[in-house]
């Protein structure tokens, strides 16, 4: 038996990090874990030691030396390959649960729909990179590009967050298409934090309580 792999997706400013922090505190006391199972909280990019260095390369503003779209794609892919090998797969094989802030579909949304890189190229790369790993559940926190910009206007943006609203709109439309195609659980991120947290808890209990009791 392997552990469960849960991913939370969405555009910048949707509240993923806040919700992952809340849910990661709740899961160990929820009754979902069995025996010696633990929860591993992680993120992309930067979910491994090497990944943290790659994250800095990807998200640094670089001023006049920004990476090309293809280089950016391959950096994200390198981060994910290491993340899976060093963090995700070992945890799942140990029967632990993994809760990740982003996974492979963020690349499809940002580099595919956002950067206009051929989707089939990305899917082919991801088929190698993901090493057979796929989430048991993906939750999409949905907000508009306009709301994302409003929420982040007080913060210093990283390179991806500096791309502007037109880029973000394309990414968001990509996420919506992927969510529909893959039957994700979509939750409105316009609600207050506690309401969103409770909806995520209900989703997890509904999906995994029965599995654990079988």
From Swiss-Prot:
Protein family: Belongs to the thymidylate kinase family.
PROSITE patterns with a match to the protein in the record: THYMIDYLATE_KINASE
Any one cellular-component term (Gene Ontology): cytosol
Pfam families: Thymidylate_kin (PF02223)
GO BP annotation list: dTDP biosynthetic process; dTTP biosynthetic process; dUDP biosynthetic process
Entry keywords, A to Z: ATP-binding, Kinase, Nucleotide biosynthesis, Nucleotide-binding, Transferase
Catalytic activity: dTMP + ATP = dTDP + ADP
Name of the molecule in the record: Thymidylate kinase
Entry EC no(s): 2.7.4.9
Binding-site list for ATP: 10-17
Organism this protein belongs to: Prochlorococcus marinus subsp. pastoris (strain CCMP1986 / NIES-2087 / MED4)
The keyword Transport is assigned to this record: no
UniProt GO molecular function: ATP binding; dTMP kinase activity
Keyword presence, Protein biosynthesis: no
The protein's role, per its UniProt record: Phosphorylation of dTMP to form dTDP in both de novo and salvage pathways of dTTP synthesis.
InterPro entries: P-loop_NTPase, Thymidylate_kin-like_dom, Thymidylate_kin_CS, Thymidylate_kinase
């Amino acid at each position: 038996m392997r552990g469960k792999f849960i991913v939370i997706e969405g555009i910048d400013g949707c509240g993923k990090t806040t919700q992952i922090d809340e849910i990661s505190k709740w899961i160990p006391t929820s009754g979902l874990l069995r025996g010696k199972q633990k929860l591993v909280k992680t993120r992309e990019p930067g979910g491994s030691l090497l990944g943290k260095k790659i994250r800095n390369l990807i998200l640094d503003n670089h001023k006049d030396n920004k990476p090309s779209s293809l280089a950016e794609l391959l950096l994200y892919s390198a981060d994910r390959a290491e993340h899976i090998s060093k963090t995700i797969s070992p945890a799942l094989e140990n029967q632990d649960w993994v809760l990740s802030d982003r996974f492979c579909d963020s690349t499809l949304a940002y580099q595919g729909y956002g950067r206009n890189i051929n989707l089939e190229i990305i899917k082919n790369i991801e088929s190698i990179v993901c090493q057979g790993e796929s989430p048991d559940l993906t939750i999409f926190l949905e907000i508009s590009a306009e709301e994302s910009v409003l929420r982040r206007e007080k913060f210093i943006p990283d390179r991806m967050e500096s791309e502007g609203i037109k880029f973000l709109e394309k990414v968001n439309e990509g996420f919506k298409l992927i969510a529909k195609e893959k039957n994700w659980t979509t939750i409105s991120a316009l609600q207050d934090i506690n309401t969103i947290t409770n909806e995520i808890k209900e989703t997890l209990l509904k999906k995994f309580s029965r599995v654990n009791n079988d």
